[in-house]
């Protein structure tokens, strides 16, 4: 019989569980909405169209779930903005899909808003290797997140947001717990209510999207919900930091032809001038903001 390639990974994890922890794990899985059985039966027998429609129907529910927790998001965004206005930074920690989403959001802030790369930092359990390939047991280490954060010299001026669909990831719990002890503002974006990650957060966001189309596959609705909240959070914070003028990304980095063209269009709209004049100003001053402000001197 061919040996399951994941046996060596799974076996020590299971054998390392005590009888008590197995019972607690079973109870925890029973109450976690993200692990509940899909409401769709026999999806392996569905047609392609039926599968696509089912996934789409489930996805439609996610924005409504996010809408319900806007008051929670408001509290978190306001607190983060206040810290960052006073010189603090924003850190995300997470494992798997949640960790990758944090890395994506952090990575988008410099090109979109022209901020330094260390203003918003995404850290994934297992390091950057885990962005592309799962790292064994990385999310189960409740000490490693704080070690990872220490590389960036995180301190009481900063903010830490834990990302975990389950709300129970040890890597995230440990990082938030130690951060709170060191006076760091903490928050989270999770998809189950009342979990240990929310308990370690000053400003929890608990967006419950229900069982996944594919049972337990939290990269789907849960991941979508987390991405929506991250979009709302980082965009709101950057607006409050003055990185937007009107409705435009005036500090975006002009790193390719598409973005230079977009920047030129922004200058055209703001100053009501033709494309050639706008392009000349953009080339001369190097940014949309400086090009626009140059005419007001």
Label the predicted regions.
Residues 237-297:
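Short, amphipathic alpha-helical interaction segments embedded in low-complexity terminal/linker regions
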Residues 12-14:
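Short terminal hydrophobic/aromatic SLiMs and anchors at protein ends
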Residues 68-83:
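A short, well-structured juxtamembrane/interface segment
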Residues 27-65:
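Cofactor-/ligand-binding subdomain signature composed of acidic, glycine-rich
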Residues 91, 95-228, 237-241:
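Glycine-rich phosphate-binding loops that contact phosphosugars or nucleotide phosphates
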Residues 4, 10, 20-23:
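Polybasic, lysine-rich low-complexity intrinsically disordered segments
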Residues 56-62, 122-132, 260:
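Gly-rich Lys/Arg/Thr-decorated short loops/hinges at beta-loop-alpha junctions or inter-strand turns
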């Amino acid at each position: 019989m061919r040996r399951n390639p994941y046996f060596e990974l799974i076996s020590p994890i299971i054998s390392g569980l005590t009888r008590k922890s197995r019972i607690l794990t079973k109870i925890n899985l029973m109450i976690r909405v993200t692990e509940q059985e899909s409401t769709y039966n026999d999806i392996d027998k569905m047609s392609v169209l039926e599968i696509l429609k089912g996934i789409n129907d489930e996805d439609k529910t996610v924005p409504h779930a996010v809408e319900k927790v806007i008051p929670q998001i408001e509290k978190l965004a306001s607190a983060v903005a206040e810290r960052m206005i006073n010189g603090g930074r924003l850190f995300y920690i997470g494992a798997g899909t949640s960790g990758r989403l944090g890395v994506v959001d952090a990575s988008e802030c410099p090109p979109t808003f022209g901020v330094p790369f260390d203003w918003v930092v995404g850290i994934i359990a297992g390091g950057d290797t885990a962005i592309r390939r799962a790292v064994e047991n990385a999310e189960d280490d409740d000490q490693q997140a704080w070690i990872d954060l220490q590389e960036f010299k995180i301190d009481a001026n900063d903010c830490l947001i834990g990302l975990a669909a389950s709300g129970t990831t040890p890597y995230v719990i440990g990082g938030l717990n130690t951060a709170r002890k060191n006076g760091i503002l903490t928050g989270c974006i999770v998809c189950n209510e009342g979990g240990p990650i929310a308990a370690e957060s000053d400003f929890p966001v608990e967006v419950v999207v229900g069982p996944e189309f594919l049972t337990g596959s939290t990269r789907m609705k849960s991941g979508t919900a987390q991405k929506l909240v991250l979009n709302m959070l980082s965009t709101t914070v950057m607006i409050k930091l003055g990185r937007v003028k009107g409705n435009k990304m005036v500090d975006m980095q002009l790193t390719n032809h598409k973005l230079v063209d977009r920047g030129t269009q922004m200058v055209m709209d703001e100053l009501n001038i033709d494309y050639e004049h706008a392009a000349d100003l953009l080339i001369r001053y190097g940014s949309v903001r400086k090009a626009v402000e140059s005419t007001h001197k």
